[in-house]
């Protein structure tokens, strides 16, 4: 079973074993959303990584950002 997906973090697995985890808030330079608890970006990255670790088809995980920035850090306005 895979992770519970959210809009602000993409989980895209290719047939060749590459898993892309993408920060998806380009309008905020992919700032981290929420808190470290269950719904925040950091918690979700952990959930996605655990799902990748449990999936024997995943050979490598690429962590990247949508748009021109990887991640600007915590969203202080949230």
Describe the role of every protein-language-model region.
Residues 68-78:
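Amphipathic alpha-helical interaction surfaces in cytosolic regulatory modules
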Residues 1-66:
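Conserved CoA-thioester-binding segment of acyl-CoA-metabolizing enzymes
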């Amino acid at each position: 079973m895979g992770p519970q997906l959210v809009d602000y973090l993409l989980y895209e697995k290719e047939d060749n074993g590459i898993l892309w985890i993408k920060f998806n808030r380009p309008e905020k330079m992919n700032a981290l959303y929420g808190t470290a608890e269950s719904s925040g970006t950091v918690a979700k990255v952990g959930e996605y990584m655990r799902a990748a670790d449990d999936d024997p088809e995943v050979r490598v995980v690429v962590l990247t950002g949508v748009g021109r920035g990887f991640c600007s850090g915590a969203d202080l306005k949230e």
